[in-house]
Amino acid sequence: MAFTNNIREIREQRGIYQDDLATAIGYSTKTVGRIERGDGTPSAEFMLRISKYFDMLVEDVFHVED
């Protein structure tokens, strides 16, 4: 099972820097960048925090692929 996401697209559309997003959700810039690139599996907590920050549903930010 793999996760894809729209984090970078949403962040850039809203003019949010990766550093600012990371600070706002309580994760390192390195972690946010890694998840944006699809280099890791996001935790449930990460998905909830970022979705809440964007005021979006988790499934609108993250997608599960088999």
Model regions: which residues?
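A short, Lys/Arg-rich alpha-helix, primarily the initiator
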Residues: 1-13
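Short amphipathic recognition helices of helix-turn-helix/homeodomain-type DNA-binding modules
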Residues: 60-66
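Alpha-helical residues within the helix-turn-helix
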Residues: 12, 23, 52
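Short alpha-helical DNA-recognition segment
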Residues: 16-33
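DNA major-groove recognition helix of helix-turn-helix/homeodomain DNA-binding modules
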Residues: 45-60
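Residue-level signal for the short linker/turn that defines the boundary of a DNA-recognition helix
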Residues: 5, 15-16, 42-45
